[in-house]
Every structure is written in C-alpha cells, then in structure tokens.
Amino acid sequence: MATVKVTLIKSMTGRIPNHKLCVKGLGLRRIGHTVEVQDTPENRGMINKAYYMLRVEG
C-alpha cells in the first residue's frame, strides 16, 4: 500500500478540538514533526479535515 508523508506546519493552539484530534490521530506531536502514514480513506479524511495545519507529500 502507498504511503504519504505528513508534516505539521502550524500550531494546534486555539484550533477546533476535532481537528486537533485528527492531527494526533495521524501521529503528529509538534511543529515540524513528519510521519509516514498509509494512504487509506481514513487517513485521507483526517488530512482533509486539518489540511490548513499540514503539508502533505506523496
């Protein structure tokens, strides 16, 4: 299965609680942290919800 690199580029402070949970669900902890996640519909949904805080490659 394909993977996607996701990087947190903006702070989670003051964001919508559900968007914070999506970022945590992707495994991101701090600004500049990058993780590789499987390209599944579930992960795509979390990425799409919090897109304004993330950089996605691949």
Swiss-Prot record:
The keyword Cytoplasm does not apply. It comes from the Bacteria. GO terms for molecular function: structural constituent of ribosome. InterPro entries: Ribo_uL30_ferredoxin-like_sf (IPR036919), Ribosomal_uL30_bac-type (IPR005996), Ribosomal_uL30_ferredoxin-like (IPR016082). Gene3D superfamilies: Ribosomal protein L30, ferredoxin-like fold domain. One of its GO terms (cellular component) is cytosolic large ribosomal subunit. GO terms for biological process: translation. Keywords: Ribonucleoprotein, Ribosomal protein. The keyword Ribonucleoprotein applies. HAMAP family: Ribosomal_uL30_B (MF_01371_B). PANTHER family: LARGE RIBOSOMAL SUBUNIT PROTEIN UL30M, MITOCHONDRIAL RIBOSOMAL PROTEIN L30. Part of the 50S ribosomal subunit. Belongs to the universal ribosomal protein uL30 family. This is Large ribosomal subunit protein uL30.
